[in-house]
Design a protein with these regions (language model features):
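Polybasic "coupling" helices that flank or enter modular domains
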Residues: 108-109, 124-191
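Cyclic nucleotide-binding regulatory module and flanking cytosolic helices
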Residues: 1-43, 88, 93-95
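Structural motif
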Residues: 65, 110-112, 214
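Small beta-barrel nucleic-acid-binding modules, principally OB-folds
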Residues: 38-42, 48-51, 167-171
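Cyclic nucleotide-binding regulatory domains
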Residues: 46-108
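Phosphate-/nucleic-acid-contacting segments
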Residues: 167-263
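Cyclic-nucleotide recognition modules
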Residues: 81-139, 143, 147
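A conserved hydrophobic position in a structured secondary element of the catalytic/binding core
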Residues: 25, 61, 83-84, 107, ...
Length: 263
């Protein structure tokens, strides 16, 4: 599949800055994968794939992030996962023949590396490490989706707002998140007025400061204390880039990836 018409940015065939996930690969594996990687700058709001499409690209965020959403009847989508430089998005059934049920949108614009799914799976057939990369990325998406389902059911909008902001900040590696309160409201499935009220309360406490199209975290400890425990469950030690380096939430059994009961 070619580049989506929704994606903008000049595409180059080489780039010297890898993502956190790509940096976790061995030199030999990185060279194997690098033969087919392309790089581009994608803008916020760009649609990476739509529900019902045969998404055939895998995306490695370098300085941006992708929001994975389940679309609703009114055309909006509820976010179930955020993929930043710690992971990759686009690992579906692998055949390219089964339409995907989610929508992926660039949550934070930036640099991305992409590869055709067919080319990735061809390389993975020669390299066990790439098979593990795909497995931990799928497990990370599943963990986020499961935890988000729980979070949306049992936690308050305030706690979820704080969790979302922290998670996105971690994914981007920055305390300034370029996002509108309207976008957060849509991602969390809450009213815009509710998101505005929560942001105002946090700003009065000095926890965050809000500007046009951006939110800056001023008191991370305070924000963490206000967030639900889903934030710690989805912490950096569970990210695909860390799992490739060894340890973490998942363990490997006969080539498969499963939950590590020791964590």
């Amino acid at each position: 599949m070619g580049q989506s018409p929704h994606l903008f940015g000049a595409i180059a065939t080489d780039d010297s800055t890898p993502s956190s996930l790509l940096s976790a690969l061995s030199g030999e594996t990185a060279r194997l994968l690098g033969r087919d990687l392309r790089h581009g700058d994608f803008r916020e709001g760009a649609v990476v794939w739509d529900a019902g499409s045969d998404a055939g690209q895998i995306f490695f965020p370098i300085s941006g992030a992708i929001s994975i959403r389940v679309p609703t009847r009114n055309g909006h989508g509820i976010e179930v996962a955020t993929i930043g430089p710690e992971g990759a998005a686009g690992f579906h059934d692998g055949s390219g023949t089964v339409p995907v049920l989610t929508q992926a949108v660039v949550q934070a614009g930036g640099r991305f590396a992409t590869i055709a799914a067919e080319a990735f799976h061809a390389a993975a057939s020669e390299c066990e490490e790439l098979g593990r990369l795909a497995a931990v990325c799928k497990a990370w998406l599943l963990l986020q989706s499961q935890r988000t389902a729980l979070c949306n059911t049992v936690h308050s909008a305030d706690a979820r707002f704080c969790r979302w902001l922290l998670r996105t900040s971690d994914a981007l590696g920055a305390d300034i998140v370029r996002v509108t309160q309207e976008a957060i409201a849509e991602a969390l499935g809450i009213r815009r007025t509710t998101a505005n009220l929560i942001a105002q309360q946090l700003q009065r406490k000095g926890t965050i400061s809000c500007g046009r199209g951006k939110i800056a975290i001023r008191d991370r400890a305070g924000l963490q204390s206000a967030a639900c425990d889903c934030y710690s469950v989805l912490g950096p030690r569970h990210w695909p880039c860390e799992l490739l380096r060894g340890g973490g939430l998942f363990r490997r059994i006969d080539g498969a990836v499963s939950l590590n009961p020791r964590i």
